[in-house]
């Protein structure tokens, strides 16, 4: 089994820890806990770069090795890094588990060394009709991010 971890930090006290696990050629399981967010839905994506030298702005676009349009996690046409939304409760926290086969930790297309980003607004899953729907899901600003690193 391969494991990875991301420690998220950002503006306004947003923080969290995300764990990734993958068994051989199986899907990747993502578990996380976030805090300091406004209640509601927040876009949650793997971005192409692990560079946080300019905060979350330097993490690049959504991870998209197949050069597809933005979509929902269950859509055939989507960026590999499109993980949809996390639901934040009234207390400002979110706990979640996502299982996804497009974000491997091993082999071709590994997400190790890339970044996770939590956005200010809901991801419209490419279906909102906004000019940004097909590229970013119109998910708004980048509130918190972190580098995806290999874990022992």
From Swiss-Prot:
Chief location bin: cytoplasm
Catalysed reactions listed for this entry: 2 superoxide + 2 H(+) = H2O2 + O2
Highest taxon listed in the record's lineage: Eukaryota
Disulphide linkage map: 56-145
Chain positions recorded as Zn(2+) binding sites: 62, 70, 79, 82
Cofactor(s), names only, from the UniProt record: Cu cation; Zn(2+)
Free-text cofactor note: Binds 1 copper ion per subunit. Binds 1 zinc ion per subunit.
Key words of the record: Antioxidant, Copper, Cytoplasm, Disulfide bond, Metal-binding, Oxidoreductase, Zinc
E.C. no: 1.15.1.1
Any one cellular-component term (Gene Ontology): cytoplasm
Entry keyword Oxidoreductase: yes
Enzyme type, top EC level: oxidoreductase
Any Pfam family: Sod_Cu
Cell compartment(s), UniProt: Cytoplasm
Quaternary state and interactors: Homodimer.
Function: Destroys radicals which are normally produced within the cells and which are toxic to biological systems.
UniProt protein name: Superoxide dismutase [Cu-Zn]
Naturally occurring in which organism (per UniProt): Panax ginseng
Primary gene name: SODCC
């Amino acid at each position: 089994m391969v494991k990875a971890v991301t420690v998220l930090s950002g503006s306004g006290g947003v923080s969290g820890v995300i764990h990734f696990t993958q068994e051989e050629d199986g899907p990747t399981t993502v578990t996380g806990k976030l805090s300091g967010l406004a209640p509601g839905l927040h876009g949650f994506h793997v971005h192409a770069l692990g560079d946080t030298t300019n905060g979350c702005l330097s993490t690049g676009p959504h991870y998209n090795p197949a050069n597809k349009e933005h979509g929902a996690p269950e859509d055939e046409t989507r960026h590999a890094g499109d993980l949809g939304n996390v639901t934040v409760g009234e207390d400002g926290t979110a706990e979640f588990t996502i299982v996804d086969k497009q974000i491997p930790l091993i082999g071709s297309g590994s997400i190790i060394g890339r970044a996770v980003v939590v956005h200010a607004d809901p991801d419209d899953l490419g279906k909102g009709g906004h000019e940004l729907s097909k590229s970013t899901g119109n998910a708004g600003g980048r509130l918190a991010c972190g580098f995806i690193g290999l874990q022992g």
